Amino acid sequence: MPPKKKKVTGLIKLQIQAGAANPAPPVGPALGQHGVNIMEFCRAYNAATESQRGWVIPVEITVYEDRSFTFITKTPPAAKMILKAAGIEKGSGEPHKTKVAKITEAQVREIATTKLPDLNANDLDAAAKIIAGTARSMGVTVEG
C-alpha cells in the first residue's frame, strides 16, 4: 500500500537574501504562525542558496499537517537581474519620461535564459520580450 499523502496546511512565499536567512522578520513570523521549525528551515535554505550569495532568492515553502515542510527556490527576480546588468541601484521614478540606464539585447537574452523555468513563456524569444518589458517599465532602455 502506498504511503498516505500528507495534507498541506499552508503555502508561504518569501524573498530572502541567499545564504542569509535568519529567524528575524520576515522569516520568523511567517513560519512561526504555521508552527514550522524556523532554525531548521534557515539552515536548509542557507545551505541550498550558498552558491548564490548577493542575490535575493524567492522561495515557496509548503507546510504540511505534521508541521514538516518542503521548499522550492526560484530564480532571482527579473528586476534585480536587470539592475545588476545595468549597474544601477534602482529603477527610474518616472520610467517613461526619465531613462536611467541601457542594457543590450544580449544581456536581455542572458537574463531570459536564466529566468525561463520560472516565466510563463514557451521559448526564449517570448521570455526575452517579458524581460525587455520589465526593463522598460523600470526606465531601462534595451538596445539592439
Swiss-Prot record:
One or more lysine residues are methylated. SMART domains: RL11. GO terms for molecular function: large ribosomal subunit rRNA binding; structural constituent of ribosome. Forms part of the ribosomal stalk which helps the ribosome interact with GTP-bound translation factors. GO terms for cellular component: cytosolic large ribosomal subunit. Gene3D superfamilies: Ribosomal protein L11, C-terminal domain, Ribosomal protein L11/L12, N-terminal domain. Pfam families: Ribosomal_L11 (PF00298), Ribosomal_L11_N (PF03946). HAMAP family: Ribosomal_uL11. This is Large ribosomal subunit protein uL11. PANTHER family: 60S RIBOSOMAL PROTEIN L12, LARGE RIBOSOMAL SUBUNIT PROTEIN UL11M. Part of the ribosomal stalk of the 50S ribosomal subunit. Interacts with L10 and the large rRNA to form the base of the stalk. L10 forms an elongated spine to which L12 dimers bind in a sequential fashion forming a multimeric L10(L12)X complex. Disulfide bonds: none annotated.
